[in-house]
Amino acid sequence: MAKNIQAIRGMNDYLPAETALWQRIENSLKQVLSGYGYNEIRLPIVEQTPLFKRAIGEVTDVVEKEMYTFDDRNGDSLTLRPEGTAGCVRAGIEHGILYNQEQRLWYVGPMFRYERPQKGRYRQFHQLGCEVFGLQGPDIDAELILMTARWWRVLGIADHVKLELNSIGSLDARARYREALVAFLEQHKDQLDEDCLRRMYTNPLRVLDTKNPQIQVLLNDAPVLTDYLDDESREHFEALGELLTQSGIPYTVNPRLVRGLDYYNRTVFEWVTTSLGAQGTVCAGGRYDGMVEQLGGHATPAVGFAMGLERLVLLVQSVNPDFKAQPGVDVYLISSGAGTQVAAMQLAEKLRDALPQLKLMTNYGGGNFKKQFARADKWGARVALVLGENEVAAGQVVVKNLSNGEQDTLAQADVASRLATLLD
């Protein structure tokens, strides 16, 4: 017997029992996006490698350690996208939809990073991202956060996520802070681990992200970025905080929050949870006003965020188990006897015409009535329609409510209206 081929480590299959919940969650998210006027953009999963190096930063964990990069047959370096913002900006520039325009976009799909697989973190994972172009005020930053807060309420997880905010200022402000931080780190070289020593000169702000508890204690005495903010960034941040407070959104200022990608400026934020064990990020983003110009477009203010769907699904399952997938089907169509199969197919198509939202499954493969009713239960049907030879001859169908066992025999022309009532 040939050896079975398994899925790649960290790249998971999602079976129908799982995808039903995914679909309900995604549909809930999309409904909110539509309510805020955001439009979908669909992007390739493979991009030219220089796109991510320029956008994310060459001295980042993502570019240095985590990207799936390969040469194609022409010798061009390509990369499976590790995140969605860079590709969205590239598409906006390429198709001319950013210059002097306001765009509110969203996308969803798989991303790829070579990481150690663990609960909620995989090598192929799914993100839903939102990007806004052409608006630079704190009000649009606030709207993005308000929209995510609405998601948490819709999904029933609002009490299990907390908002952390910071401002990392302008490029000049970060340059001044970088000098102060490097000077502090140099004074404590002997207390830094190998990873922090490597980052100290290449990307010192990333030292603030260390998971080493001893260095975290050391950093309590480090300079704080907010002390180096330029006036415009400080005013922007204060205005954002006021908007959130007036909107009833509680938050904590986290001076160590810098995000792992180099393209951010001013506002950065994360929604975090402790309901999945150690604190983890559910959704994160911020402003990246320089990226469009950096990638060859005209200077365009921009802000956005991305949310990991695997972690979101785990959180919903953990803290709101009542948020369940919708039943597999509404109606199961049962038939038995000569000529009933064709009649069942014809009836099913007429019902789909009359009730476009109806989820109807027709029994195939035979079986007596008992077996077919068992299949109806398996698929979670709420109503069974039964066609036997007598019903076909009379132009009728038996309609059975599977929740209470009540049934009636109706003319086929009346079945659609009865189903609409039963399933309302």
Curated annotation (Swiss-Prot):
GO terms for biological process: histidyl-tRNA aminoacylation. It holds the Pfam family tRNA-synt_His. Its EC number is 6.1.1.21. SUPFAM superfamilies: Class II aaRS ABD-related (SSF52954), Class II aaRS and biotin synthetases (SSF55681). Gene3D superfamilies: Anticodon-binding domain, Bira Bifunctional Protein, Domain 2. Keywords: Aminoacyl-tRNA synthetase, ATP-binding, Cytoplasm, Ligase, Nucleotide-binding, Protein biosynthesis. One of its GO terms (molecular function) is ATP binding. It catalyses: tRNA(His) + L-histidine + ATP = L-histidyl-tRNA(His) + AMP + diphosphate + H(+). GO terms for cellular component: cytoplasm. The keyword Thylakoid does not apply. Its main location: cytoplasm. InterPro entries: aa-tRNA-synth_II, aa-tRNA-synth_II/BPL/LPL, Anticodon-bd, Anticodon-bd_dom_sf, His-tRNA-ligase, HisRS-like_core, HisRS/HisZ, HisRS_anticodon. It comes from the Bacteria. It is found in: Cytoplasm. Belongs to the class-II aminoacyl-tRNA synthetase family. PANTHER family: HISTIDINE--TRNA LIGASE, MITOCHONDRIAL-RELATED, HISTIDYL-TRNA SYNTHETASE. Homodimer. This is Histidine--tRNA ligase. The lineage of its organism: Bacteria, Pseudomonadati, Pseudomonadota, Gammaproteobacteria, Enterobacterales.
